[in-house]
Amino acid sequence: MSEERKVALITGITGQDGSYLTEFLISKGYYVHGIIQKIFHHFNTIVKNIYIKIDMLKEKESLTLHYGDLTDASNLHSIVSKVNPTEIYNLGAQSHVKVSFDMSEYTGDVDGLGCLRLLDAIRSCGMEKKVKYYQASTSELYGKVQEIPQSETTPFYPRSPYAVAKQYAYWIVVNYREAYDMYACNGILFNHESPRRGPTFVTRKITRFVAGIACGRDEILYLGNINAKRDWGHARDYVEAMWLMLQQEKPEDFVIATGETHSVREFVEKSFKEIDIIIKWRGEAEKEEGYCEKTGKVYVKIDEKYYRPTEVDLLLGNPNKAKKLLQWQIKTSFGELVKEMVAKDIEYIKNGDKYN
């Protein structure tokens, strides 16, 4: 007798993680259901890309999209009941750290209480013994870091409304796992990027700018704290770790990271190097600027408006537990990530793709 086909429900399917996870799960033979907000009725480029790839796999019938929102409990209950999933991946969030200072209540509602609403939907549908639940947690929980590198046992010290909301979600997952014996786990993912990263995030902001320079634009790139250091990986690698977490005998929380740290400054330099421009620096603090070593032309300046009210200076993850128990490995290096992002952004500009 053949094994019953698995059914996954993904919130945040229009984001970079959601799109890569969708493609990954369908390649594994899953039926995938995704929750999208009404504003995405036109199907943005990421959703289009999912459908294109699925068409190539001749598996378009494996993806169904539903209108919904993490702030609407009755809607979530209805979707969970209708879809009857075996796995739920909660990737939906207001995930921009700086925006969370301006929209703190909304961020808490979506990122914190949204997780609770999904867990309660699972329980109210009587599926707590059937559904495996993945919660997208974040390295921003560590904030003002208490130790280097950060592992599953490192104390949290959140430094933004986004991180505080995610800390609530983290602990409500732990609480429901222990109180109701649910298969629910947190993936504490360190920064992960891709050509599908939103254009307001610093990595994508950099690669889009560099691509523009390569295509003949004449502009200045304004950044905030270029000395901030992050552990950057590729989203395509990280979604496999999400899936692996739900394939274990018992639910556990895992740090997913590369174990390497790089500064925003280094990301800028590597991005420009992809178009044969060597960036040098002069000046200090907000007066610092990056210029082309060969021509002296200034390309990068500092703008204080991009500083966070409370900065997170260094994030460096320890992925040893995931490597040992999940047999998970990084496949894309930092250099390969930057190269892919710049190349794809050049392609986007040349193709006139306004949604990217």
UniProtKB/Swiss-Prot annotation:
Full protein name: GDP-mannose 4,6 dehydratase
Binding-site list for NADP(+): 12-17, 69-70, 91-95, 106, 166, 192, 197
Top class in the EC scheme: lyase
Pfam families attached to this UniProt entry: GDP_Man_Dehyd
One Gene Ontology term from the biological process aspect of the record: GDP-mannose metabolic process
Reactions catalysed, as given in the entry: GDP-alpha-D-mannose = GDP-4-dehydro-alpha-D-rhamnose + H2O
Source organism per UniProt: Dictyostelium discoideum
Similarity annotation: Belongs to the NAD(P)-dependent epimerase/dehydratase family. GDP-mannose 4,6-dehydratase subfamily.
GO molecular function: GDP-mannose 4,6-dehydratase activity
UniProt-listed InterPro entries: GDP_Man_deHydtase, NAD(P)-bd_dom, NAD(P)-bd_dom_sf
EC number(s) per entry: 4.2.1.47
Keywords: Lyase, NADP
Listed CDD domains: GDP_MD_SDR_e
Function: Participates in the synthesis of GDP-L-fucose, catalyzing the conversion of GDP-D-mannose to GDP-4-dehydro-6-deoxy-D-mannose (GDP-4-dehydro-alpha-D-rhamnose) which is further catalyzed by GDP-L-fucose synthase (ger). GDP-L-fucose is important for the synthesis of fucosylated N-glycans which are expressed on the cell surface.
Domain of life, source organism: Eukaryota
Known pathway: Nucleotide-sugar biosynthesis; GDP-L-fucose biosynthesis via de novo pathway; GDP-L-fucose from GDP-alpha-D-mannose: step 1/2
Cofactor: NADP(+)
Residues annotated as the enzyme's active site: 138, 140 (nucleophile), 162 (nucleophile)
Stored HAMAP family: GDP_Man_dehydratase
Coiled-coil boundaries: none
